[in-house]
């Protein structure tokens, strides 16, 4: 780790740079959804911290982003349904050699710039689209535009057999993108990570399918308590290429090519408990994927993911507490990769457990602590090392909302085990300072 004086100077520089951005524009503009609803970001996000959703934020998303006025309604233009989101910061890796690239450790740089189209289309339909110019370590070019988050919805309440039922449909670009709980694959803590810090070699396949697939599904929310969804995901090519814009499909290993339509299911139960709310749920997906995205033919590798999760929130104006837990196990059948030699075994497994909690003091600052453990079977050909990919990671994060449009974040990742090894694991520890600006 660099000397403490360097970190102090870095924090001072980060605050100073953000301060220059705040002074002339002080929250004169707000993100598109806030403009549409007339509410502050904290109405939908705990402490104003995107993407952690409040009960109202989950309701807003499930009802297809239709609360409030559309951009054009009542014969007049109401607001611009566009916004810009940017991040910049710096990462210090305990052993600079583990950064990607090593020279990037300690250097301030932009992380990404995102343009989003978000808002109500009709009384029953809404959209959330993001296109991002982001930095990817080791890629050529390192900076590139591409589709990011896509979620198009239609939803409407019905009375069925004396029960209130919200029925909806969704089209999105990744399993979990449509989910409203922060235990899901797409929106789990830590919500943000450094583009250059090292990470575990193994992760379940659905964690990496976003932007490679196009999904279509239907859901029902009964009495605002029981939620059930069934969706199917296919490769985002042909008429769905707009969902994978920017993906290097012609580059070996640049994408994941799935076979046919792959089922994803979600079932949750939630209830209000005074100022608190509780959710328990399960999620799963079965996926057939080709080992070579340039040759989508022949046999596939088969993945089955089954997970369970829970979340509890206690939210008041002054104090906000959230506790989350998730468990996911993936079983793998390398029907194609094993005969080709790109897998050392005919089958395998990965298990990920994520436990985390957060406290927010009003809408000003938040402190989060998480523990993520990944275990799995050894696979030298797949991971590039002979040991198991077992990794244990502690995450400590401090967030400060300078305004509802600007957030400062300091995140520390501490590894006690990294890709099967305890010795030297701390060399992958990292400190990540980041600033978020959304208008």
Which ranges hold each PLM region?
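Sequence/structural signature of outer-membrane beta-barrel proteins
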Residues: 89-96, 132-139, 159, 174-178, ...
């Amino acid at each position: 780790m660099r000397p403490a004086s360097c970190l102090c100077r870095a924090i001072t520089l980060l605050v100073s740079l953000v301060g220059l951005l705040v002074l002339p524009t002080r929250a004169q503009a707000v993100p598109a959804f806030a403009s549409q609803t007339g509410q502050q970001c904290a109405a939908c996000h705990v402490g104003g911290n995107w993407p952690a959703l409040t009960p109202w934020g989950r309701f807003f998303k499930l009802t297809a982003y239709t609360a409030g006025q559309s951009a054009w309604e009542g014969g007049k233009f109401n607001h611009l349904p566009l916004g810009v989101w940017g991040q910049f910061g710096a990462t210090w890796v305990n052993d600079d050699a583990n950064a990607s690239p090593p020279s990037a450790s300690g250097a301030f740089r932009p992380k990404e710039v995102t343009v989003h189209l978000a808002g109500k289309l009709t009384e029953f339909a809404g959209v959330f689209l993001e296109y991002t110019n982001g930095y990817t370590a080791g890629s050529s070019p390192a900076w590139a535009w591409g589709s990011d988050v896509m979620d198009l919805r239609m939803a409407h309440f019905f009375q069925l057999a004396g029960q209130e039922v919200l029925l909806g449909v969704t089209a999105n670009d990744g399993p979990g993108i449509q989910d409203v709980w922060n235990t899901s694959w797409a929106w789990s803590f830590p919500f943000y990570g450094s583009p250059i810090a090292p990470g575990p070699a193994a992760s379940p396949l659905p964690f990496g399918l976003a932007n490679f697939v196009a999904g279509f599904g239907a859901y029902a929310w009964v009495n605002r308590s029981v939620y059930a969804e069934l969706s199917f995901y296919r490769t985002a090519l042909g008429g769905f290429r707009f969902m994978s814009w920017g993906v290097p499909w012609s580059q070996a290993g640049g994408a994941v090519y799935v076979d046919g339509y792959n089922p994803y299911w979600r079932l949750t139960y939630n209830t209000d408990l005074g100022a608190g709310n509780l959710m328990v749920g399960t999620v799963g997906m079965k996926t057939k994927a080709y080992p070579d995205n340039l040759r989508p033919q022949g046999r596939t590798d088969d993945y089955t993911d089954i997970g369970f999760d829970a979340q509890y929130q206690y939210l008041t104006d002054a104090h906000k507490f959230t506790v989350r837990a998730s468990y996911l196990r993936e079983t793998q059948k390398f029907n194609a990769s094993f005969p080709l030699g790109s897998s050392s075994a005919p089958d395998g497994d990965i298990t990920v457990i994520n436990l985390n909690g957060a406290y927010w003091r009003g809408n000003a600052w938040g402190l989060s602590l998480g523990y993520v453990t990944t275990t799995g079977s050894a696979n030298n050909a797949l991971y590039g090392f002979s040991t198991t990919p077992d990794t244990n990671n502690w995450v400590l994060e401090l967030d400060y909302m300078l305004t509802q449009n600007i957030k400062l974040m300091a995140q520390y990742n501490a590894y006690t085990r990294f890709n099967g090894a305890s010795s030297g694991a701390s060399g992958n520890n990292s400190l990540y300072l980041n600033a978020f600006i959304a208008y």
